[in-house]
């Protein structure tokens, strides 16, 4: 198979770009440059070559897993002698702030909804399960946003549990990056799709991340296939600062933006502010809560300097 060999004991098979790209086989690329543009995050560039090299082999692998999952469900139904409700295949996608989780999730959604057959693929972000801004302020958690304690984890677990129970018209709260808050009385409604992609910082976390709120089940208990998007922290920090600078001249300039006051910063002040936010919040959360969950993933995508994925690690 051309796998990289290593003396280190690991539960993962490791592929470089060229080795992974060969696993695409005959999967067709149906996306065009025009299709790709709206899938990219504000500060991210990604080519069709990256889609072909990395995401098409991944889509092929996931489709194999989905086929096996359907067979397993058929066996279970036959054994139990009952017809269970339709339940979606759940894919979780985790990683740090600024690593490009949202772009990866949207590309996967676009590929899986049209190959090998047309099917319904819903994308839900766990941002919607953050506590509303007023509650975070009341609990003095504003500077802990994104940390485990800032999420209504019981509501999130109830959501994924309902998905796996075959419930219909399940509501997921919607988060606004403009107002930095949950949008009141607005929801995404999930109604028995074939696949759900659940994207967020916390989808691989376990009980060790919620010591003050013990419970017996976690989001990962309901996930069929988990992905972690990885990169060196120095790269993540530089990407975050770069994104902050671009937002300063765009989204932050909107008077309705929660971060409107940052639009008035000079470039030097903006770099200093973004660096402080990273060091005191995002970087700390990365080290304490996000990186420790990485090894629980079924597949790890490792990015290099240009945001391109250089290495793929697949659980054996």
Curated annotation (Swiss-Prot):
It is found in: Cytoplasm. It holds the Pfam family PRK. GO terms for cellular component: cytoplasm. InterPro entries: P-loop_NTPase (IPR027417), PanK (IPR004566), PRK/URK (IPR006083). ATP binds at residues 95-102. Pathway: Cofactor biosynthesis; coenzyme A biosynthesis; CoA from (R)-pantothenate: step 1/5. The keyword Cytoplasm applies. It catalyses: (R)-pantothenate + ATP = (R)-4'-phosphopantothenate + ADP + H(+). Keywords: ATP-binding, Coenzyme A biosynthesis, Cytoplasm, Kinase, Nucleotide-binding, Transferase. Disulfide bonds: none annotated. One of its GO terms (molecular function) is ATP binding. Its main location: cytoplasm. Belongs to the prokaryotic pantothenate kinase family. This is Pantothenate kinase.
């Amino acid at each position: 198979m051309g796998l990289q060999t290593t003396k280190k004991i690991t539960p993962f098979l490791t592929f470089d770009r060229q080795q992974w790209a060969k696993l695409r086989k005959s999967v067709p690329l149906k996306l065009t440059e025009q299709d790709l543009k709206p899938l990219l995050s504000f500060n991210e560039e990604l080519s069709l070559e990256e889609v072909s090299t990395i995401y098409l082999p991944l889509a092929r692998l996931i489709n194999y897993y989905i086929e096996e999952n359907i067979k397993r469900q058929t066996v279970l139904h036959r054994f139990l002698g009952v017809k269970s409700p339709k339940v979606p295949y759940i894919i979780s996608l985790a990683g740090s702030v600024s690593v490009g989780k949202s772009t990866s999730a949207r590309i996967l959604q676009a590929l899986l909804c049209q190959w090998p057959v047309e099917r319904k693929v819903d994308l839900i972000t766990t941002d919607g399960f953050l506590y509303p801004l007023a509650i975070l302020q009341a609990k003095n958690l504003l500077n802990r946003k994104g940390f485990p304690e800032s999420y209504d984890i019981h509501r999130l677990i109830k959501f994924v549990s309902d998905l796996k129970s075959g419930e219909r018209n399940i509501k997921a709260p919607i988060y606004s990056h403009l107002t930095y808050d949950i949008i009141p009385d607005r929801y995404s409604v999930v109604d028995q799709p074939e696949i759900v992609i659940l994207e967020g910082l916390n989808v691989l976390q376990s009980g060790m991340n919620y010591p003050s709120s013990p419970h017996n089940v976690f989001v990962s208990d309901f996930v069929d296939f988990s992905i972690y998007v990885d990169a060196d922290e120095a790269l993540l920090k530089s990407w975050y600062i770069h994104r902050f600078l671009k937002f300063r001249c765009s989204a932050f300039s909107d008077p309705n933006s929660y971060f409107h006051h940052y639009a008035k910063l000079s470039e030097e002040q903006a770099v200093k502010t973004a660096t402080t936010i990273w060091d005191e919040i995002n970087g700390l959360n990365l080290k304490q809560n996000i990186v420790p969950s990485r090894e629980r993933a079924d597949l790890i995508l490792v990015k290099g300097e240009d945001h391109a994925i250089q290495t793929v690690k697949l659980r054996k």
